[in-house]
Amino acid sequence: MEAASHGAYEIGGRTVGFNITLAHEQFPNPYLTECFTFEYFFARKVSLAMAAKVFVFFPGGFGTMDELSEILCLTQEGKMPKMPIFLIGKDYWETFDQVIQKMATLKLINESDEKIFEVTDNLQNVVDAANKIGHPKISENFYDGFRQASEV
């Protein structure tokens, strides 16, 4: 996510990071105007889900799959509002998409669940979705809750 933060930072945008403390890797990137560090994955995932208006997933490892699965499940079950969910990189996400299609074929999920997300290489789709939603003006009180949670 450093590249996205870098671009926004360069044009004077607010860049907020939700970092997790791990035994290896996962350091905040230098382009954040604000960073919240969490000890526990569940607290980070809840915070990410509460703060987001659009979800954009790039190729990643188990953590990425964990976060994506959580968002898909919460969306499918109606536990959070439907929001645009983009998986960037068709070559990478093709197999994942096939697994989801197989789940629908086997009636393990509804056919409509296949449409919860969009696999694309077209970043303009993401920009258009974000622009439709607009840039929410989130009060500082909203982030105060994250500050408190990240200090636990």
Labelled PLM ranges:
Residues 35-41, 115-126:
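Short acidic-hydrophobic, aromatic-tinged amphipathic segments that line or gate anion-handling sites
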Residues 99-117:
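N-terminal glycine-rich dinucleotide-binding loop that anchors FAD/FMN and/or NAD(P) in oxidoreductases
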Residues 119-152:
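SAM-dependent methyltransferases
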Residues 39-88, 134-142:
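Active-site/ligand-binding-proximal alpha/beta "capping" segment
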Residues 1-6, 93-104:
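Glycine-rich, charge-decorated loop segments at or immediately adjacent to ligand/cofactor-binding or catalytic sites
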Residues 2, 66, 94, 127-128:
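Alpha-helical elements of the RecA-like P-loop NTPase motor core of helicases
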